[in-house]
UniProtKB/Swiss-Prot annotation:
GO terms for molecular function: ATP binding; metal ion binding; methionine-tRNA ligase activity. This is Methionine--tRNA ligase. Pfam families: Anticodon_3 (PF19303), tRNA-synt_1g (PF09334). Zn(2+) binds at C145, C148, C158, C161.
């Protein structure tokens, strides 16, 4: 039985910098498109996201910036929330891992894992700064590479030769912040024995959706699981109940943020127990959207943590991964100057242009590349030349000739064939959305626009108008507007603003959108939406949907 309740989460953006196009197309646009599609299907959707606000990268960069940790994450939490809004990401609640509910549930996860013998303490040697009076994690350490001798190697990897190692393996290790020499000291940490859950995890991943090319990677990762430290010597983080001066590793606490974020949402709507109907009900369908670099944590580690709990937390049903989006052949990097200012871009180009192109080139099974030339080509050829042209020419002709009120006319077989083909493409689009393929959905959108253009060209109503055959003209316009109604429906998850403009211009009488949130259209993708027999349209002066990109 198909679930009527859908839980959607996407990887929590790290509160350590602005989001770029790679982040958006990797996790947040796909999640938003899926959420919009499922709402159209009439499902009860909850899309949760939020900022990941702990970890060494945050403490180090906050200190380098001369800012307090909370001040630093507050800045990026607001920035990420604003970015979601600008990009039309219809998240239902944007929380953060510094929320009120997070510490208690993280500590509860830990205690449950301890009670089941899955977490054990172990003494290891780590680098200690006498001057600073604390252990230093790898990001705080520099030294001489044990492989090539480079004297400014990082604590986890040598940027000169590419070698990776433990920070304690560095020669002449020193503090990155003060330059003080470091020594080795014993310290006690808690380790999660993931290898003890290998068989459970292998069985689990066999039953979930993964992109085909990821399944072997995930299986191999689980086969080679080993214990992982869940604690760190830091002051910024969730305190560990039974280890003094320790906090939880960010990889341990961050995914629990999906649950605490849902608790945060429940409190915000005045129903503190509402989170349970999504996290403690196995009939819910749970889809998680992430970049490929987060796969191991979400396919193995977080499910292992859930398996070790006393409460039956919902585990993911579909783990939807994306590869990397490159910019002109290189990874997005603000520090290297290889990035696009998102605010400046959106001041120049419409949001739906960006959403469409990012969806059309989505790195679903392999890395893909964003280039301005492809952006320009797709906008001008597809959005202006095919899509916008179809909508504009039909409405302009209808308004010019006074055919603004259309109702179901007498149709010929070729009209019925056209309607049937249009319906088939709309149903194809639904299948693509259901299978998490933005690329195929974009192709189908353009295929439907091309079908409509072809029909309008072939039937040439302007010739019939000259002959005075207005009944036939109205029949052609009716069929073209019906096609545009379907085009708006299948476009909405990717281009919501454009879809709403089309529906406003053709004004199908079967729809009453006045009471709906335009960002969360609900229950439109129904059999009645596809029924044309009783449909009527009240056409308005066309508004240009897209302009050429110079």
């Amino acid at each position: 039985m198909e679930s009527s309740r859908i839980l959607i989460t996407s990887a929590l953006p790290y509160a350590n910098g602005p989001l770029h196009f790679g982040h958006i197309t990797g996790a947040y646009l796909p999640a938003d498109v899926y959420a919009r599609f499922q709402r159209l299907q009439g499902k009860e959707v909850l899309y949760i996201c939020g900022s990941d606000e702990y970890g060494i990268a945050i403490t180090l960069n906050a200190e380098l910036a001369g800012m307090g940790y909370q001040e630093y994450v507050d800045m990026y939490h607001k920035l990420h929330k604003d970015t979601f809004k600008k990009l039309g990401i219809s998240v239902d609640f944007f929380s953060r891992t510094t929320n009120t509910y997070h510490p208690a549930i993280v500590q509860d996860f830990y205690r449950n894992l301890q009670e089941r013998g899955l977490v054990e303490n172990q003494v290891t040697e780590q680098l200690y700064s006498e001057e600073e009076g604390k252990f230093l994690a790898d990001r705080y350490v520099v030294g001489t590479c044990p492989k090539c001798g480079f004297d400014r190697a990082r604590g986890d990897e040598c940027q000169q030769c590419g070698a990776d190692y433990e920070a304690r393996d560095l020669k002449e290790p020193r503090s990155k912040l003060t330059g003080a020499a470091l020594s080795l000291r014993d310290t006690e940490h808690a380790y999660l024995h993931l290898e003890r859950m290998k068989e459970d995890l292998l069985a689990f991943v066999q039953g979930i959706y993964l992109r085909p090319h990821m399944r072997n990677f995930v299986t191999d990762y689980i086969e080679h699981l080993r214990p992982r430290a869940v604690t760190r010597d830091l002051s910024w983080g969730i305190p560990v109940p039974d280890l003094e001066n320790k906090v939880f590793y960010v990889w341990f606490d961050a995914p629990i943020g999906y649950i605490s974020g849902t608790m945060d949402w429940a409190a915000s709507i005045g129903d503190p127990e509402a989170w349970k109907k999504f996290w403690l009900d196995d009939t819910v369908t749970y889809a998680q959207f992430i970049g490929k670099d987060n796969t191991s944590f979400h396919a193995a580690i977080f499910p292992a943590m859930e398996i070790g709990q006393s409460l039956p937390y919902k585990k993911v049903d579909a783990l939807v991964t994306s590869e990397f989006l490159l910019l002109e052949g290189f990874q997005f990097s603000k520090s290297d100057g290889n990035f696009i200012d998102m605010d400046a871009f959106l001041e120049t180009y419409s949001l739906d242009k960006l959403r469409y192109v990012l969806a059309a080139i989505a790195p679903e099974t392999s890395d893909s590349e964003f280039s301005f030339q492809e952006f320009k080509t797709r906008c001008n050829s597809e959005l202006v030349g095919k899509y916008g042209n179809f909508v504009n020419r039909v409405l302009a002709f209808a308004v010019k000739n006074g055919c603004t009120e259309l109702s179901s006319p007498q149709l010929e077989q070729k009209d019925l064939d056209f309607i049937s083909k249009s319906q088939k493409l709309a149903k194809d689009a639904a299948e693509h959305y259901a299978q998490y393929s933005l690329r195929k959905a974009c192709s189908t959108i353009m295929e439907l626009a091309a079908l409509g253009n072809g029909y309008f060209n072939d039937e040439a109503p302007w010739k019939l108008a000259k002959e005075g055959n207005w009944n036939r003209v109205r029949a052609i316009l009716f069929c073209a507007c019906y096609c545009q109604k379907l085009l708006a429906l299948i476009s909405y998850p990717i281009m919501p603003e454009t879809a709403l403009k089309i529906l406003e211009m053709i004004a199908p009488h079967s729809l009453d959108l006045g009471s709906q949130d335009p960002d969360r259209l609900q229950s439109l993708w129904t059999d009645s939406f596809f029924d044309y027999s009783e449909e009527k349209f009240s056409l308005k002066e066309p508004e240009l949907l897209f302009t050429m990109v110079e």
